[in-house]
UniProtKB/Swiss-Prot annotation:
PANTHER family: EUKARYOTIC TRANSLATION INITIATION FACTOR, EUKARYOTIC TRANSLATION INITIATION FACTOR 2 SUBUNIT 2. The gene is eif2b. Residues 1-32 are annotated as: Disordered. Residues 1-12 have a biased composition (Basic and acidic residues). SMART domains: eIF2B_5. HAMAP family: eIF_2_beta. This is Translation initiation factor 2 subunit beta. InterPro entries: IF2/IF5, TIF2_bsu_arc, Transl_init_fac_IF2/IF5_dom, Transl_init_fac_IF2/IF5_N, Transl_init_fac_IF2/IF5_Zn-bd. eIF-2 functions in the early steps of protein synthesis by forming a ternary complex with GTP and initiator tRNA. It comes from Natronomonas pharaonis (strain ATCC 35678 / DSM 2160 / CIP 103997 / JCM 8858 / NBRC 14720 / NCIMB 2260 / Gabara).
Length: 134
């Protein structure tokens, strides 16, 4: 059996590897209106999945949505103003893209670090270092 035949056979027998999307997914934001505030009910499970500090994600959402926010006694994020679920989801997806997913290998196995006062995304999978938030 020649090299090409062996390679073809190996590729046929190798199981397909699921993409990163199947391995990493963020819960859809569960938001509802409560007076003049939007309450992000499942903020804590989202933070747990992102493996980031709640204050960092909250600050990003405040800047992205142009509002103020606080975390209530039940761990829910309360955003001042009315925001649709789709808008909050878009902001969370922007956060994931800039502060969670490695731009080099596309995996979520990253840590946020400070280097010379700047936030850097360090990938534990491929070792890449890149500016966070890009």
């Amino acid at each position: 059996m020649g090299y090409e035949e062996q390679l073809d056979r190996a590729l046929e027998e190798t199981p397909d590897i699921e993409g990163t999307a199947a391995r990493f997914s963020v819960p859809d934001p569960d938001v509802r209106q409560e007076g003049n505030a939007t309450v992000y009910e499942n903020f804590q499970p989202t933070i747990d999945r992102l493996d980031r500090e709640e204050s960092h994600v909250m600050k990003f959402l405040q800047n992205e949505l142009g509002t103020s926010a606080n975390i209530d006694e039940r761990g829910r994020l309360r955003l001042t103003g009315e925001f649709r679920q789709a808008r909050v989801e878009e902001a969370i997806n922007d956060y994931v893209e800039g502060y969670v997913i490695c731009p080099e290998c596309g995996l979520p196995d990253t840590r946020l670090e400070k280097e010379n006062g700047a936030e850097v995304l360090r990938c534990e999978a491929c070792g890449a270092r890149s500016p966070a938030g890009n």
